[in-house]
Amino acid sequence: MLDRIIYKKTTLACLAFILLSLLGAAFYGLLFEKASSSGKTQQSKTQSSKVKTARVMANGDILIHNGLYGSAEQADGTYDFKPFFEYAKDWISSADLAIGDYEGTISPDYPLAGYPLFNAPSEIADAMKDTGYDVVDLAHNHILDSGLSGALNTVKTFDKLGMPSIGVYKKDRDKEDILIKNVNGIKIAILGYSYAYNGLEANLSAEDYEKHMSDLNEDKMKAEIQEAEKKADVTIVMPQMGVEYRREPTQEQVTLYHKMIDWGADVIFGGHPHVVEPSETVEKDGEKKFIIYSMGNFISNQRLETVDDIWTERGLLMDVTFEKKNH
């Protein structure tokens, strides 16, 4: 009976997320057009118009709290998280590129945990693959919850399913290529950064930290975003920072995200506050750039009954279409 109660609350929470997500998709969906001066511009689905399009979706935090394991656990002791995505699957699978923000780790060497440390079984990755995600954002403050080995195993788990990730480098941040996906003939670079790692970075050597972690080092971010701008048609940045449960961005967020636009970012999908924060469109060199300061939660057990904040029940599924032309 307890499992059914937990599942019902989870389903209702997911419905709340998706309803707001649909509103978010309608309200925030934008058409971006890159200028053609450098040859980085838009070709096409048809020979006549020579226009190519790429529909990109991204969502807020996927947090597997302790209360959700009861809903996912099966009679044989395995876990099935696929029902958690039931009402979003059709939307996410329809995207040309879907990016999921998985806030946790996947490590068989650590026990399952859902707060303050997060470590889920590999079935969560299976569920995300089944839902239609193509890329996973791991740039968040919980990625070291199972140590560096757990972070690297999380990357490996998604890699095996054909879902590359951002936010953790397998070998060396300074030597690894930026993730660039070719989507319908449009090259899309994706970068992720986290403000910190809940103090667990202290367990890493300075060398391991520099090699593997994608933090908010401005010099490195600037160089990476500028490199992405040169190599790709579109640059998406997913930073994690801000104040939890605050529905307005901090001045630090605003300043840094505008710097990212100046460095070459076209879209910024922000996260971390667990609530939705405002968006804005920025004009740069005659082009439209888009910032959403926080997409909120997508799947979690943060709700009115558990954290006394109804805004944690609301999240966005961003729906952005890019267009590339050759003149």
Model-inferred region functions:
Residues 2-3, 7-327:
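Acidic, metal/ion-coordinating pockets
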